[in-house]
């Protein structure tokens, strides 16, 4: 279920999806700008891998970076994540990974790779997300409401109304939040 829809932004704004049961013992977060840039963040007990692509950066048949080059030096357990059907379908123009959540690794490629556009979206700063939202939502997202979501504050009807006053499908929103394990008081 779409995490953003569950947070009250509506079907038309689906850009991000979180799946806490993506694979056995693994979670995934998917993000897209709706056109040429996409990212998948894969969480496993062995670490985390972020794969991203900008489909307009390369001639897909000739110059796309090879997965082997992007994952050179990556631990085998994390390399398996890069073999998922989602990554194969999406392709890759950048890949970063960590085993401990502190030190991140990448194999930089020549030229643009979309990382400067996509990685800031998951920097943990609510202001970054509010700025990102200006490109996609008809009204500015309220910083305080976004901050509450980032802090894990339980979703209430008041919080949903702050994000989108037109949403009132409480059971649908609650079901979506329950599915991804996000706390709520709906």
Region locations from a protein language model:
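A eukaryote-biased signal for long
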Residues: 103-186
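Intrinsically disordered, low-complexity regions enriched in Ser/Pro/Gly/Gln/His and often acidic
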Residues: 15, 22-23, 90, 97, ...
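Single conserved hydrophobic/aromatic residue that forms the stacking wall/gate
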Residues: 2-13
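Surface-exposed beta-loop interaction hotspot
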Residues: 67-124
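Short, solvent-exposed coil/turn segments at beta-strand boundaries
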Residues: 6, 24-25, 43-48, 100-101
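Aromatic- and glycine-enriched beta-alpha-beta binding-site module
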Residues: 28-92
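Short linear interaction motifs
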Residues: 11-34, 75
């Amino acid at each position: 279920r779409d995490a953003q829809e569950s947070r009250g932004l509506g079907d038309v704004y689906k850009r991000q999806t979180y799946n806490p049961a993506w694979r056995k013992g693994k979670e995934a977060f998917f993000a897209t700008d709706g056109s040429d840039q996409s990212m998948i963040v894969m969480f496993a007990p062995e670490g985390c891998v972020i794969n991203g692509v900008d489909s307009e950066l390369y001639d897909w048949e000739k110059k796309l970076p090879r997965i082997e080059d992007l994952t050179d030096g990556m631990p085998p357990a994390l390399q398996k994540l890069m073999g998922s059907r989602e990554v194969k379908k999406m392709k890759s123009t950048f890949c970063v990974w960590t085993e401990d959540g502190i030190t991140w690794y990448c194999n930089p490629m020549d030229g643009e790779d979309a990382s400067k556009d996509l990685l800031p979206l998951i920097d943990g700063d609510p202001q970054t997300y509010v700025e990102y939202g200006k490109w996609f939502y008809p009204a500015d997202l309220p910083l305080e409401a976004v901050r509450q979501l980032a802090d894990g504050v339980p979703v209430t009807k008041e919080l949903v109304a702050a994000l989108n006053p037109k949403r009132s499908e409480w059971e649908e929103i609650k079901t979506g939040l329950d599915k991804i394990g996000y706390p709520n008081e709906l």
